[in-house]
């Protein structure tokens, strides 16, 4: 198994290197003629893009833009962020494919050379096929949110597979907390990453329960409901509730502007810290 892990890591990084070279070589050198110009200029000046916004993408884009020699190089640096995000997506896709292959072929713990080649080969073929697919390659070479969103999608799903490997060990819930954190960050890029929630919910169900048709259907409904709650309530209502707090603190209590926002932020942080301490994570 140690030999498989070593080869799995080496092959994964080789696939990452191939995809990185391809995307950087074929990368757009300026702004493509659609939303990319908006995102690149907004990242450079930390401004606001069209609704619903992409604050985390813009902050990362701003960091990349700092490496530009002058303003004419900003687009290249933001586009390179998409290229690197996409190549990391390919890396985690490779490891996801090999993780499934390992569960299929290595059930008894014996790793035959033919099966080892088959699993690694499946990972290479699958990940490189996606590398050169039209839609993904298109988004990988320009300053748009879809490349970074794909990265978070691949990363969160890979994390649930890592959790599944150690689910029976102490403190395995740390992986679930990490997934929640990444999902929160991905909301600041694009909402597409939330679509991994039902799939991760099914993996959680299969790991902790004996399969039944009713149980699988119930798990699917619950995980889909979590997606709807995040999408329909938590995301839109959090900012609204923050504004309500600020209005009460300013109008009713006579406190300075943004005092309600600060209180709301401290309240949320306190609840998170309490939850971490209570669960001993």
Q: Predicted regions: what is each one?
A:
Residues 1-22, 88, 110-124, 267-281:
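Start-transfer (signal-anchor) and selected internal transmembrane alpha helices
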Residues 5-33, 130-132, 190, 230-233:
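Transmembrane signal-anchor helices characteristic of membrane glycosylation enzymes that use polyprenol
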Residues 13, 80-112, 155-159:
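Transmembrane-helix motifs of polytopic, lipid-linked glycan transferases
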Residues 24, 71-79, 104-119, 123-150, ...:
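Aromatic- and kink-enriched transmembrane "portal" helix at the membrane-lumen/periplasm boundary
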Residues 27-39, 49-61, 76:
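Extracytoplasmic catalytic/substrate-binding loops of multi-pass membrane glycan-assembly enzymes
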Residues 113, 117, 156-175, 203-214, ...:
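Membrane-interface transmembrane helices that cradle and orient dolichyl/undecaprenyl
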Residues 121-124, 159, 166-184, 213-225:
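Short hydrophobic alpha-helices at membrane interfaces in multi-pass membrane enzymes
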Residues 192-204:
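Transmembrane-embedded, aromatic-rich helix segments that form part
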